[in-house]
């Protein structure tokens, strides 16, 4: 199917969507490859034909590591052959012999890649890691070979140009317009000479993105805080001290080491009593990639911004953000920037109130100094403890994993959408802890398969995410096979798995993604389920989070695992109220990073190479976000999301999706809350539609108007 051709490997992590772009501009990545070519691909390979298991799910019990590479390589070859046949079809281009044919293409590759994508992240081993390194650049080259296929694009353009007279239904018309846009965005409309220019820009961009990552990793390692004086770490728990000692041993150092997280603020600053230590750690974080040494990233990122602007100009856009947002819900950088700008006044006003409260606390303790960013976390933690503190050991007995799943996650899905769940212990899994459920619609009709892989393992990537083994498509006759992965602590044998409320929220969040995939009801796989823009894809998952703290749902699952008694009201109230604590600060740092991202990516190609420090300061001042005690969540010099991880001109998407989900939950509250009528309407008008129509129009039609920022501000406690 066409969405595979412009390929991206998606990994959803704790509420965010991290997208590793393997397609456009990575053809130059086909360098040295140490992995041996795959062996012969034949009927003995489990991916040779469609699975005979229910829902065509993957036969994990029959797959050897080597089967993945053989099937992926055969799938690539088959896909290129299929595309070549479409591009060179002697018949005149039609919707059926071009677009429908493309949607049918690549099924072998999809079967193999989707399964490999799962195990390489959730249950990897050295052989799978070698295959990953080998296949990533080959997948990129495959995408380029299709994106820039001149004959194929000529057929696509011919149909696009006459689309209004073809009598296409709405979904088919959407497919034509969307995929034409994707090919144009990839450079298919360029002359051969300009395609070569684009390739060179892409190659340099890819190289510099890797350079940025390499420099930043080295900078973070060089600026970790190391000490042999235990007194400087006063305030850390024994567990934290033990972890710091282990970190020192790993680096063959004496004493203790506190490694840098990639955010500006560091977790340990909330506990360290010594102000000089806090200051030193903050400075290490703030200046980590600005030392004027080999690890300094400023020249690299400035050139990256310039390259992206030049690429956008070549493709006919005024700036990179304008190019990148053409297929997003926001559509234009002006819309994204206007949205962020509107959130700044209320957010910074709340941060100012919080700062005054913290300064009062500092003064009451005889501090004798003015609040600085390295003080915020320490004193905010004292306020949090006083107002909202609860011991995790008090809370966890009320959040037993199976109970949360069945009486919380499944209960909410049943009340809203009529779903029921039956565990399928007869189906193979990729690891013994994985569970499989068949999901049924209200009338008992099979809807999907859903896997959950919840426990931490050494060979599993961190975080939490959702993805699919099989996507829904009426054209292909497939129903969804979806999975959620997390990293909860595994209990000792015979003991219950007890969760924090953050873990509970993660379960609801990832299941929201799963519902989006399971409810898909579309003809074409390229438009199905979660195949939607970044600033929309987190909306269904974040919306589903709300049910974790909904009073009716919470009371149903928050019960002691031994006695069945409900959580005491006072403790439950603390959990709910703590959600809005310190949100002026937290949201200000997010807005600052989001605005910085867009400021870098609205630069025109004619702009001179910018000095990152000057540019950053001036940008924050223009946005009224140059606040001494609230630094950006990421400084430009270590903003990994936008210089390496594919979030350039897209970091705003987290907050945009939050606006959508808060408006949606407000609508539910205004219309009776947790009811089947509300759930069914939301499912049929939003969750089932995938990318089959303009998402803004679709959302507005369901909501009954355009979303506003007011519910978002309310949910964060900012008004």
Question: Where are the model-predicted features located?
Answer:
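Short pre-active-site segment immediately N-terminal to the catalytic Zn-binding motif
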Residues: 489-508
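Signal peptide processing junction and immediate N-terminal pro/mature segment
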Residues: 28-36
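Short His/Asp/Glu-rich catalytic/ion-coordination signatures at enzyme active sites or charged loops
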Residues: 52-67, 116-135, 158-200, 259-299, ...
């Amino acid at each position: 199917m066409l969405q595979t051709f412009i390929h991206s490997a998606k990994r959803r992590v704790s509420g965010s969507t991290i997208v590793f772009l393997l397609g456009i501009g990575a053809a130059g990545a086909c360098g040295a490859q140490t992995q041996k070519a795959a062996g012969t691909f034949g009927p003995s390979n489990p991916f040779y034909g469609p699975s005979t298991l229910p829902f065509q799910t993957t036969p994990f019990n029959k797959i050897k590591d080597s089967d993945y590479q053989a099937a992926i390589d055969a799938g690539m070859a088959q896909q290129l052959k299929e595309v070549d046949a479409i591009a060179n079809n002697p018949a005149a281009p039609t919707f059926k012999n071009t677009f429908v044919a493309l949607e049918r293409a690549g099924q072998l590759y999809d079967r193999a890649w989707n399964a490999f994508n799962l195990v390489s992240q959730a249950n990897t081993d050295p052989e799978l890691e070698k295959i990953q390194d080998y296949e990533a650049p080959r997948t990129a080259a495959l995408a380029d070979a299709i994106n820039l296929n001149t004959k194929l694009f000529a057929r696509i353009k011919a149909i696009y140009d006459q689309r209004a007279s073809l009598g296409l239904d709405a979904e088919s018309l959407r497919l034509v317009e969307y995929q034409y846009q994707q090919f144009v965005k990839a450079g298919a409309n360029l002359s051969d000479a300009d395609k070569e220019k684009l390739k060179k820009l892409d190659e340099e961009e890819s190289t510099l993105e890797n350079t940025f990552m390499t420099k930043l990793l080295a900078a973070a390692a060089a600026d970790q805080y190391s000490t042999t004086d235990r007194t400087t770490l006063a305030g850390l728990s024994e567990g934290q001290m033990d972890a710091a000692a282990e970190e020192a041993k790993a680096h063959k150092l004496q004493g203790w080491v506190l490694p840098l997280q990639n955010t500006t603020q560091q977790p340990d600053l909330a506990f360290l009593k010594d102000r000089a230590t806090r200051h030193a750690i903050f400075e290490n974080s703030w200046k980590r990639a600005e030392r004027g040494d080999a690890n300094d990233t400023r020249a690299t990122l400035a050139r990256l911004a310039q390259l992206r602007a030049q690429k956008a100009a070549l493709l006919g856009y005024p700036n990179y953000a304008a190019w990148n947002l053409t297929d997003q819900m926001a559509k234009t950088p002006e819309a994204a920037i206007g949205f962020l700008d509107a959130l700044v006044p209320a957010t910074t006003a709340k941060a100012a109130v919080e700062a005054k409260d913290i300064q009062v606390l500092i003064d009451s303790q005889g501090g004798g100094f003015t609040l600085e960013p390295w003080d915020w976390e320490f004193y905010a933690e004292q306020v949090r403890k006083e107002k909202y503190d609860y011991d995790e050991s008090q809370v966890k007995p009320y959040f037993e994993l199976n109970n949360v799943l069945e009486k919380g996650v499944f209960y909410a899905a049943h009340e809203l959408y009529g779903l029921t769940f039956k565990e399928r212990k007869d189906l193979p899994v990729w690891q013994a802890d994985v569970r499989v459920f068949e999901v049924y619609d209200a009338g008992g009709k099979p809807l999907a398969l859903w896997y959950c892989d919840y426990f931490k393992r050494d060979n599993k990537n961190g975080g939490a995410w959702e993805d699919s083994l099989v996507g829904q498509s009426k054209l292909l006759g497939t129903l969804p096979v979806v999975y959620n992965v997390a990293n909860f602590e595994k209990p000792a044998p015979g003991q219950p798995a007890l969760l924090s409320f953050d873990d509970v929220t993660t379960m609801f969040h990832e299941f929201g993604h799963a519902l989006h995939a399971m409810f898909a009801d579309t003809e074409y796989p390229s438009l199905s389920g979660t195949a939607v823009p970044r600033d929309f894809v987190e909306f269904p998952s974040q919306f589903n989070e709300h049910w974790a703290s909904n009073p009716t749902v919470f009371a149903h699952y928050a019960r002691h695992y031994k006695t069945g008694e409900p959580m005491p009201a006072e403790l439950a109230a603390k959990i709910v109220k703590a959600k809005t604590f310190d949100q002026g600060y937290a949201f200000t740092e997010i807005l600052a990073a989001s605005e910085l991202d867009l400021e870098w990516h609205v630069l025109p190609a004619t702009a001179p190479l910018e000095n990152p420090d000057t540019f950053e300061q001036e940008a924050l001042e223009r946005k009224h976000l140059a606040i001494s005690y609230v630094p950006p969540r990421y400084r430009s010099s270590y903003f990994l999301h936008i210089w390496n991880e594919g979030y350039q001109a897209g970091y705003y998407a987290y907050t945009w999706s939050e606006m959508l989900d808060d408006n949606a939950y407000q609508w539910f509250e205004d219309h009776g809350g947790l009811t089947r009528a509300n759930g069914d309407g939301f499912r049929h008008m939003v969750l089932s539609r995938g990318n089959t129509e303009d998402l803004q129009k679709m959302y507005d039609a369901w909501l009954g108007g355009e979303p506003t920022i007011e519910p978002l501000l309310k949910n964060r406690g900012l008004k």
